[in-house]
UniProtKB/Swiss-Prot annotation:
It comes from Pseudomonas savastanoi pv. phaseolicola (strain 1448A / Race 6). Keywords: FAD, Flavoprotein, NAD, NADP, Nucleotide-binding, Oxidoreductase. Belongs to the bacterial renalase family. It holds the Pfam family Amino_oxidase. Its EC number is 1.6.3.5. Catalyzes the oxidation of the 1,2-dihydro- and 1,6-dihydro- isomeric forms of beta-NAD(P) back to beta-NAD(P)+. Has a preference for 1,2-dihydro-beta-NAD as substrate. May serve to protect primary metabolism dehydrogenases from inhibition by the 1,2-dihydro- and 1,6-dihydro-beta-NAD(P) isomers. FAD binds at A13, D32, K33, R40, Q56, Y57, I128, D302, V309. This is Renalase. It is an enzyme of class 1 (oxidoreductase). Substrate binds at Y57, F58, T59, A60, R61, S96, P97, D98, T185, R308. One of its GO terms (molecular function) is NADP binding.
Amino acid sequence: MTVPIAIIGTGIAGLSAAQALTSAGHQVHLFDKSRGSGGRMSSKRSDAGSLDMGAQYFTARDRRFATAVKQWQAQGHVSEWTPLLYNFHGGRLSPSPDEQVRWVGEPGMSAITRAMRGDLPVSFSCRITDVFRGEQHWNLLDAEGENHGPFSHVIIATPAPQATALLAAAPKLASVVAGVKMDPTWAVALAFETPLQTPMQGCFVQDSPLDWLARNRSKPGRDDTLDSWVLHATSQWSRQNLDASREQVIEHLHGAFAELIDCAMPAPVFSLAHRWLYARPAGSHEWGALSDADLGIYVCGDWCLSGRVEGAWLSGQEAARRLLEHLQ
């Protein structure tokens, strides 16, 4: 019997590792506490259509990742997004075009991880609470007390604070990962029946509780019945208001949006708030991935590199590369 490799987390990093390992002929089994794949790359189904509440777009600078993106494009899972960009600074809103190529999943960010997952075996709504090693193999324990295993190796592909809690069997790794701080982000979606009278489709914001806003319907393949917008608060504001109610967050960020936009703003017909507790790493690292190859445990995620989507994908590739190298 072939003993599979366990991968905890079905965001870009975990799925990138899974693809690399299955391409090399290995069996994997994925676990995720959510109901679907994607992590911060997931889209939220709502009365206002599919909303990208997490990652807004991504770029491809590394040659290997750019090749993967071109494959996704050929398969119809991603498209270029060319928004009319603005900048808000010192109380002034001004056009801010640039040459950056931006990619989005189509018809939502979830399309990418759904395609990457394919028909790989996965246990959703399964929160792993303990990772422990027997004489030969690894086993996982979930929040319901159910045991999963055996597994030959374990890859943990979650935000750093969640990974730390699963590394009791690898104290050296745990101490490194425990030092990684991640910043929160409050995200709010607002939808309007009548489109806002502004050409703006994306905006980088300074001197405000807001950090970024995007006109969701301007992305390829999105539902355009309503004029939906996604607002991201700054890490600082999000941390200061971490335990605020969703209603308070919506009210405050809606107000900040109304202050910066250059047109009248009616009352939204739909609003939604989501708190990303671990939205992005507070600093960048150059680890690629972390591992204790002798134990057979590996850790990857965007926080091992740049904190970007590309960083997550590359980190998953690196975790798989190290595992395969050790098997040789």
